[in-house]
Amino acid sequence: MKFLAAASLLVASTLAVPTSSGGSCRPRPPPGGGNGGNGGNGGNGGNGYQPCPAGLYSNPQCCATDVLGVADLDCKNPSSAPMSGDNFKSICNAVGQQAKCCVLPVAGQAVLCQDSINGGGNGGNNGGNGGNNGGNGGNNGGNTDYPGGNGGNNGGNNGGNNGGNNGGNNGGNNGGNNGGNNGGNNGGNNGGNGGNGGNGYQACPAGLLYSNPQCCSTGVLGVADLDCKNPSSAPTSGDDFQKICANGGQQAQCCSIPVAGQAVLCQPAIGGGNPGGNGGNNGGNGGNGGNNGGNNGGNGDYPGGNGGNNGGSNGGGNGGNGGNGGSFKCPSGLYSVPQCCATDVLGVADLDCGNPSRQPTDSSDFASVCAAKGQRARCCVLPLLGQAVLCTGA
């Protein structure tokens, strides 16, 4: 019996689990994988804002003095490239000036200017894609007498949809906001929508000359248009204006007044009729009268007849006088004012104009009268500081 008791104690001591830190237990497995990656950032706002239309009025300027809505003085380049219509105005307002689109800045005098156009750059591009899925969690701990802890949960779910929708209509602020927040569960929230288009679209600039939107069929040297009419509906953007007119086979234009589509404030003088021709030569002298009638016939059994009558009187009267010469006139209508002008601006405007010193008799005489003062003969709409141009691009 003593032997059996000793044997049982030996077996029990052999099977006992060590309790000290220096024992031979298997270490606990490591935890699972980390969270998913961050979502991508949304795209920045798009560039491409043009403060002025292409063509004649393509120079953005900050101007101090407006002259009747058609010219400006004391102009200079904006201090930085405008990002939108409001930004252009803000840059110029900061120095006490106005945002203008001008023909050419000559010694601070912009000559021909019109108001800037509204709107902003295109909205931002699509936001970036969300981050990739988070890494898979670690495997579960191995099965043992004391199993390891469960592996970490899987990383974040799908990395998020595309950062943002399209950047919105023209104008507006920057495009979508940043694509998404931290990854974690969803890889990132959707990026913000792109900015909306700028409000208050004006098809044509305000002012005296170019405020009437028109759809025109025929362009004349880029400064005049024929066969113009109002667009069929109010344009909502520059592209919409062009589309409305293109549907009728016409072009979008900004015009002064739709008067049979004629444009351009000053044009080269065109002549009236030449002076009347000289009168015909005087009529020839009348023929001499006929000879005297014959003597009476002698007496006889058959007396002769009476002599003929005397010849006719003198010939017809002198010919009429020649007609008087004509006087020069500009064509009736839009270009009815004859002017002598000193300075031509790109063939579409004139400065320093005045009435000719006398009434010209014909186009050559008109040119001679003006040339005597070192000026050119022109037919103008109105002598208003010589500013001109009826139509320009949208």
UniProtKB/Swiss-Prot annotation:
Biased composition (Gly residues): 33-42, 148-157
Keyword tRNA processing: no
Pfam families named among the record's database cross-references: Hydrophobin_2 (PF06766)
Residues in the signal sequence: 1-16
PTM comment: Several N-termini starting at positions 17, 20, 22, 28 and 48 have been identified by direct sequencing.
Disulfide bonds: C52-C101, C62-C92, C63-C75, C102-C113
UniProt keyword Calcium, yes or no: no
Gene source species: Claviceps fusiformis (Ergot fungus)
Biological process (GO), any one: capsule organization
Chain residue ranges for the region called Hydrophobin 2: 200-270
Subunit structure, as described in the record: Homotetramer. Further self-assembles to form highly ordered films at water-air interfaces through intermolecular interactions.
Keywords per UniProt: Cell wall, Disulfide bond, Repeat, Secreted, Signal
Family note: Belongs to the cerato-ulmin hydrophobin family.
Annotated region described as Hydrophobin 1, given as residue ranges: 48-117
Subcellular location: Secreted, Cell wall; Secreted
Gene Ontology terms: cellular component: extracellular region; hyphal cell wall
Protein task: Aerial growth, conidiation, and dispersal of filamentous fungi in the environment rely upon a capability of their secreting small amphipathic proteins called hydrophobins (HPBs) with low sequence identity. Class I can self-assemble into an outermost layer of rodlet bundles on aerial cell surfaces, conferring cellular hydrophobicity that supports fungal growth, development and dispersal; whereas Class II form highly ordered films at water-air interfaces through intermolecular interactions but contribute nothing to the rodlet structure.
Region span, Disordered: 17-42, 135-157
Region (Hydrophobin 3): 326-394
Protein name as it appears in the record: Class II hydrophobin TH1
